[in-house]
Amino acid sequence: MNLKTAIRPTRRRAAVLGAVAGVAALTLTAATGPASAARAGHRPSEAKPTVVLVHGAFADSSSWNGVIERLRRDGYPVIAAANPLRGPASDAAYVHSVLKRVTGPVVLVGHSYGGSVISEAAADSPQVKALVYVAAFAPDKGESALELSNKFPGSTLGAALDPVPFPLPGGGTGTDLYIKADKFHHQFAADVPEPVTDLMAATQRPVAASALDEKATTAAWKTIPSWDLVTTQDYNIPPAAQRFMARRAHAHTVEIKASHAVSVSHPGAVTRLIEQAARTTTR
């Protein structure tokens, strides 16, 4: 069963879900602790750019923990934004508000669906000097994550999804998508120990079904230098789709034998690519 089949009943509600603005209760996870680098006007004294991390569907900001630890150890200020997962346009607006609080250059990093979000958010954010796609979507204008996922064979996500209805603020019903708990390890993070993936499954953040079918309105990778980490054992986004997007974006590309949850299983490799991108902002 492909992903399009799994979420087809939600297409007529895409316009409504895309307008959901339930982000007021969402928090910003800043790797710098209470004295957050996200504080307006704050810029650490070091010349290194701020790294802003945007998680994707079926995850939360803690999926970046291993990457954050390494970046901070190397002297980078880091912010891990809480992606609302409601739709690329509204999620990008939220991330854009995070970027406005940062002074100086930014390396913007997106995992999975977060790639769609950073492509939109960076378009109106001149301080973004580099984009890093980590097992991520990099849609062109008019493309959706769903379309790109189904463009090449290999994704088994559709059969692993658990659709859950939720009430919309203005009336009606939307659909959130989770990965079934008994499918999570194999589908999302096969190279992560099962005790860890059990926790990840329990704490996963759902994505609005309509978000995966919402078309991109811009593609920041056309004007901002990009880096791409392709995961060759990925059952969410087919490796062939990742290669297609990376090649089209003329991204500096690295391939790794890893699952979709590469930031958890291989945080060192993710960090190295981010730092490679970051070094270009200080040249």
Which residues does each predicted region cover?
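Gly/Ala-rich beta-loop-alpha elbow adjacent to hydrolase catalytic centers
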Residues: 109-114, 118
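Flexible "cap/lid" loop of the alpha/beta hydrolase fold
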Residues: 127-128, 132-171, 208
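Post-His helix in hydrolase/transferase enzymes
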Residues: 264-280
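Secretory targeting and sorting signals
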Residues: 1-38
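Conserved serine/cysteine hydrolase catalytic core
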Residues: 202-249, 253-267
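Active-site catalytic motif of lipid deacylating hydrolases and related acyltransferases
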Residues: 42-104
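Conserved alpha/beta-hydrolase catalytic His-Asp/Glu region
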Residues: 173-206, 210-219
